[in-house]
Curated annotation (Swiss-Prot):
InterPro entries: Ribosomal_uS8, Ribosomal_uS8_CS, Ribosomal_uS8_sf
Full protein name: Small ribosomal subunit protein uS8
Taxonomic lineage of the native organism: Bacteria, Pseudomonadati, Pseudomonadota, Gammaproteobacteria, Candidatus Pseudothioglobaceae
Stated role: One of the primary rRNA binding proteins, it binds directly to 16S rRNA central domain where it helps coordinate assembly of the platform of the 30S subunit.
Family: Belongs to the universal ribosomal protein uS8 family.
Record note on quaternary structure: Part of the 30S ribosomal subunit. Contacts proteins S5 and S12.
UniProt keyword annotation of Cell inner membrane present: no
Species of the source: Vesicomyosocius okutanii subsp. Calyptogena okutanii (strain HA)
Keywords from the named record: Ribonucleoprotein, Ribosomal protein, RNA-binding, rRNA-binding
Biological process per Gene Ontology, one example term: translation
GO terms assigned for molecular function: rRNA binding; structural constituent of ribosome
Length: 131
């Protein structure tokens, strides 16, 4: 059976791995998940990530980050879902916790944070929020 929301699955795996204090988590890879992991690493929410395996069954290995034995990611929420897509213009990009968190946006220029999308004057689909 196919997965209906692979991005939500990735976020749930990260959330569950952090609850049991795992150092890393394996997720089936895709270009979009790779881009989301790249944004998470740039913003300091994960330590690193790599892709392992052959073409048909690539695995994205995400190394999680902790501070004082607590996960760096406090809340990870999927916003745009297959059942309800959320698209925003550059002026409507939401802020998370008054700028303490980030939103990840898929734009025509690639996957980026909401702040970068605002700076580049592009809108897109709001994938998730992290703080």
């Amino acid at each position: 059976m196919s997965m209906s929301d692979p991005i939500a699955d990735m976020l749930t795996r990260i959330r569950n791995a952090q609850l049991v204090k795992k150092k890393e988590v394996n997720v089936p890879s895709s270009n979009l998940k790779f881009a989301i992991a790249g944004v998470m690493q740039q913003e300091g929410y994960i330590e690193s990530f790599s892709v392992n395996g052959v073409v048909a069954s690539k695995i994205l290995k995400i190394k999680l980050k902790y501070y004082d034995n607590k996960p760096v990611i406090e809340k990870l929420k999927r916003i745009s879902k297959p059942s309800l897509r959320v698209y925003v213009s550059n002026s409507k990009i939401p802020s998370v916790m008054n700028g303490l968190g980030i939103v990840i946006v898929s734009t025509p220029k690639g996957v980026m944070t909401g702040q970068v999308a605002l700076d580049q004057n592009v809108g897109g689909e709001v994938l998730c929020s992290i703080y």
